[in-house]
From Swiss-Prot:
Null mutant phenotype: Does not affect the mycelial growth rate, the hydrophobicity of the mycelia and conidia, or the conidial virulence on silkworm pupae. Leads to thicker aerial mycelia in darkness and quicker growth rates under abiotic stress. Promotes conidia production and increases the contents of carotenoid and adenosine. Increases the biological efficiency of the fruiting body by improving the fruiting body density.
UniProt keyword Signal present: yes
Species assigned in the record: Cordyceps militaris (Caterpillar fungus)
Triggers of expression: Shows a very low expression except at the early stages of fruiting body development. Expression responds positively to light irradiation.
Oxidoreductase is among the record's keywords: no
Cellular compartment(s): Secreted; Secreted, Cell wall
Identification of the protein by name: Class I hydrophobin 4
Lineage: Eukaryota, Fungi, Dikarya, Ascomycota, Pezizomycotina
């Protein structure tokens, strides 16, 4: 009985601990980008990729302006889709995984 009381008490305390909110900045020298399903036109203009409809699969992310990155404007008001932290923005390839989402 005592063990279950201690367990429930610890569970209640752990649930009540405030978490750090996901900020509007990225660590480790990464930059914030908005991914609003912007198509990669330079990849789909000609050749074999031009014949395929890859506009829904290929995309890029826009840099977030200094006012947004500095916290003057909330990211959720700027990004209509998803804000991400990118460390490797110079990517060459078909599948690039240099960004991680941040939740706002």
């Amino acid at each position: 009985m005592f063990a279950s009381t201690v367990f429930v008490s610890l569970l209640a305390v752990a649930a009540a601990v405030p978490t750090n909110p996901q900020g509007q900045s990225c660590g480790n020298g990464n930059t914030v980008h908005c991914c609003n399903a912007e198509t990669a036109n330079k990849l789909t203009k000609g050749g074999i990729l031009g014949a395929l409809d890859l506009s829904n699969l290929l995309g890029q992310c826009n840099d977030v302006t200094a006012a947004v990155a500095g916290g003057a404007v909330p990211i959720k008001n700027t990004c209509s889709s998803q804000a991400v932290c990118c460390g490797e923005i110079h990517q060459n390839g078909l599948v690039n995984l240099g960004c991680t989402p941040i939740f706002v």
